[in-house]
């Protein structure tokens, strides 16, 4: 009898919670309608499109979905969220690995920004880019409006907003710095729904936080970037290696010395690692002949068998297309691409011999192909003596990893997720985290770091803040307390407002 009473009470409570949830959603929608801000009704086609996360492993249910088309719309939507007492999250490209455009949890008012994608370049070659533009579309517009370019990543569907707020790493970073290094101003909506401009001279502390602080401080409606002239010649390349275990260790040691001391600024490099391969790839801001002169000595020094399997002279547009991997370049909305995966990341200084040996041993001992899943690792040459990224101090912007030589992305996905009926396996988390541990466990605490844009959803909020923002965390917390003391724009891992 007691169990029946307990069950009845639980069902009654669930009904009350559901009714309150529906009432809150209806209230927000009514407020948006009164402010003439577009929104999606629950269970509509638009709700299904915009309300489904890119990473289906971490899909959440928003309190409501607003679709602003101007800065004023964003401000009005923020006011509706404030009136309803819910947290508010901005979703640009929607590619956050932790679904932070949803807040990383149920119940946020989500602002779907991808209808705001305008890009314009003025006579001073300053690009004004709306907060919902994606990298591919932005690159095309910059080229079309005066042959301009911006340092950014390779995935065309990634939103400019999340990319720059987290850092903005890509194949031009070693030469031209992070995306955030080109940001000179922004128009933002604050947590009280007011609209302000930020730059080095206006709300400079908030401007500092927006450059690498991961979001959660304000909602950016427009970014302003300096740009550079798109180069006429870029050479893309791939070096294919056939290394045994011993050659892996020797090769990585040689590459580390070269990356730290010799690798020229005009070159970017990434090691693409999976169960069957370890290849080098990237871009060179120059011609193929000069690139061969750079690659051949380090290939010889690395030892083992290696071959230049691709060497293609192209231009800025051509190198963008090289790394699309079948994706559409010209993307605005609607965007309906999804994956089912777990990712992790790591930043680190020069590795000890112990760490390199442990990483190689783990790869050889544990990396057999897993049926129905595909894993890979991107090992980026991040810093070093000649890196443009490393030429800026760690505290000049909120991006806290400029002193780190290396950046890794670890990624494990389920291929046939549409027909998958089982949750992501616990063994997948353990496998990827095992790779990370081979390096992380050898590092002192103050040199451990992770890249926010390659989010690890298994971190606690305390762990995430410490690893994503390292020595800049305390300053970010103070700025958060100044501009968003009630954590209106917070998510499950964002910087907390601590004075």
Curated annotation (Swiss-Prot):
Write down the required cofactor(s). Answer: FAD
Which GO MF terms are attached to this record? FAD binding; metal ion binding; oxidoreductase activity
Disulphides: 31-80
Q: Give the binding site residues for substrate.
A: 97, 154, 270, 378, 409, 454
Q: Which organism is it from?
A: Sarocladium strictum (Black bundle disease fungus)
Task: From the Swiss-Prot or TrEMBL record, state where the protein is found.
Answer: Secreted
Which family is it part of? Belongs to the oxygen-dependent FAD-linked oxidoreductase family.
Entry's pH dependence statement? Optimum pH is 10. Stable from pH 5 to pH 11.
In this chain the FAD-binding PCMH-type domain maps to 58-230
Xref: InterPro entries: BBE, FAD-bd_PCMH, FAD-bd_PCMH-like_sf, FAD-bd_PCMH_sub1, FAD-bd_PCMH_sub2, FAD-linked_Oxidoreductase, Oxid_FAD_bind_N, Oxy_OxRdtase_FAD_BS
Q: What is its EC number?
A: 1.1.3.-
The signal peptide here is: 1-25
The active site lies at 454 (proton acceptor)
Report the cofactor remark. Answer: Binds 1 FAD per subunit in a bicovalent manner.
Q: Which residues are glycosylated?
A: 330, 366, 419
Q: How does activity depend on temperature?
A: Optimum temperature is 50 degrees Celsius.
- Mind listing the UniProt keywords for this protein, alphabetically? Disulfide bond, FAD, Flavoprotein, Glycoprotein, Metal-binding, Nucleotide-binding, Oxidoreductase, Secreted, Signal, Zinc
Q: What is this protein called?
A: Glucooligosaccharide oxidase
What does this protein's UniProt record list under function?
Catalyzes the selective oxidation of C1 hydroxyl moieties on mono- and disaccharides with concomitant reduction of molecular oxygen to hydrogen peroxide. This results in the formation of the corresponding lactones, which typically undergo spontaneous hydrolysis. Glucooligosaccharide oxidase is able to oxidize the monosaccharide D-glucose as well as the disaccharides maltose, cellobiose, and lactose.
């Amino acid at each position: 009898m007691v169990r029946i009473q307990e069950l009845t009470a639980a069902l009654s409570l669930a009904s009350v919670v559901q009714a309150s949830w529906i009432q809150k959603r209806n209230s927000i929608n009514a407020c948006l309608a009164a402010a003439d801000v577009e929104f999606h009704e629950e269970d509509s086609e638009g709700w299904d499109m915009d309300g489904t996360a890119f990473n289906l492993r971490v899909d959440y249910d928003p309190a409501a979905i607003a679709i602003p088309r101007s800065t004023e719309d964003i401000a009005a939507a923020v006011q509706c969220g404030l009136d309803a007492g819910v947290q508010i999250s901005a979703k640009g490209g929607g590619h956050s690995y932790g679904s932070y455009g949803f807040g990383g949890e149920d119940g946020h008012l989500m602002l779907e920004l991808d209808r705001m994608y305008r890009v314009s370049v003025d006579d001073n070659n300053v690009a004004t880019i709306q907060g919902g533009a994606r990298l591919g579309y932005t690159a095309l517009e910059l080229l079309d409006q005066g042959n301009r370019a911006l340092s950014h990543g390779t995935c065309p569907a990634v939103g400019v907003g999340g990319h720059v707020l987290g850092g903005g790493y890509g194949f031009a970073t070693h030469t031209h710095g992070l995306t955030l290094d080109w940001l000179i101003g922004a128009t933002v909506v604050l947590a009280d729904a007011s609209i302000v401009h930020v730059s080095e001279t206006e709300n400079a502390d908030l401007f500092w936080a927006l450059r690498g602080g991961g979001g959660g401080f304000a909602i950016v409606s427009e970014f302003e970037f300096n740009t550079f002239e798109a180069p006429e010649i870029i050479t893309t390349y791939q070096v294919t290696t056939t290394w045994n275990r011993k050659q892996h260790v020797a090769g990585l040691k040689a590459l580390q010395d070269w990356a730290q001391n010799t690798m020229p600024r005009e070159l970017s490099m990434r090691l693409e690692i999976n169960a069957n391969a370890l290849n080098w790839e990237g871009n060179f801001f120059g011609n193929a002949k000069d690139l061969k002169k750079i690659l051949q000595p380090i290939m010889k020094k690395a030892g083992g068998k290696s071959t230049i399997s691709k060497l293609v002279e192209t231009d800025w547009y051509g190198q963008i297309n090289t790394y699309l991997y079948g994706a559409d370049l010209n993307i605005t909305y609607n965007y309906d691409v999804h994956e089912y995966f777990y990712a992790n990341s790591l930043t680190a200084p020069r590795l000890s011999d112990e760490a390199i040996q442990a990483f190689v041993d783990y790869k050889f001992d544990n990396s057999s192909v897993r049926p129905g899943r595909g894993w890979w690792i991107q090992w980026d040459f991040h810093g070093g003596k000649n890196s443009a990224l490393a030429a800026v101090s760690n505290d000049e912007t909120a991006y806290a990893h400029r002193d780190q030589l290396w950046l890794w992305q670890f990624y494990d996905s389920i291929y046939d997720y549409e027909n998958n009926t089982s949750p992501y396996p616990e063994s997948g988390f353990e496998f990827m985290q095992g790779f990370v541990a081979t390096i992380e466990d050898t590092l002192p605490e103050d040199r451990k770091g992770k890249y926010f844009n390659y989010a690890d959803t298994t971190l606690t909020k305390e762990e995430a803040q410490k690893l994503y923002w390292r020595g800049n965390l305390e300053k970010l917390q103070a700025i958060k307390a100044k501009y968003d003391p009630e954590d209106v724009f917070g998510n499950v891992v964002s910087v907390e407002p601590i004075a």
